[in-house]
Amino acid sequence: MKVTLIAFLTCAAVLVLHTTAAEELEAESQLMGVGMPDTELAAVDEERLFECSVSCEIEKEGNKDCKKKKCKGGWKCKSNMCVKV
């Protein structure tokens, strides 16, 4: 009987700790989404620039006019580069 009680209390304690940690992690991720550090923004900018340039170059190789790939999140393709709208 004591073993069952100890096991039950241990599981309850682990569950409480896990739930608390998950709530803290969720709160941190929401804060990070609101104010992203400059290093993360720079990485996103470089990635969008690369994707846009590569997309336009691939389309130019087919001897057709470059139909620029839509850049997402308030960005547009201009001169083979993604620029903020």
From Swiss-Prot:
Record GO terms (molecular function): toxin activity
Cysteines engaged in disulfide bonds, as pairs: 52-66, 56-77, 71-82
Record localization: Secreted
Signal sequence extent: 1-22
Pfam families: Toxin_20 (PF08089)
Tissue and organ distribution: Expressed by the venom gland.
Main location group: secreted
InterPro entries in alphabetical order: Hwtx-2-like
GO CC list: extracellular region; host cell postsynaptic membrane
Highest taxon in the source lineage: Eukaryota
Residues cleaved off as propeptide: 23-48
PROSITE patterns the UniProt entry points to: HWTX_2
Keywords: Disulfide bond, Neurotoxin, Postsynaptic neurotoxin, Secreted, Signal, Toxin
Known role: Postsynaptic neurotoxin.
Family statement drawn from the similarity comment of this UniProt entry: Belongs to the neurotoxin 12 (Hwtx-2) family. 02 (Hwtx-2) subfamily.
Protein name per UniProt: U4-theraphotoxin-Hhn1l
Lineage of the species this protein comes from: Eukaryota, Metazoa, Ecdysozoa, Arthropoda, Chelicerata
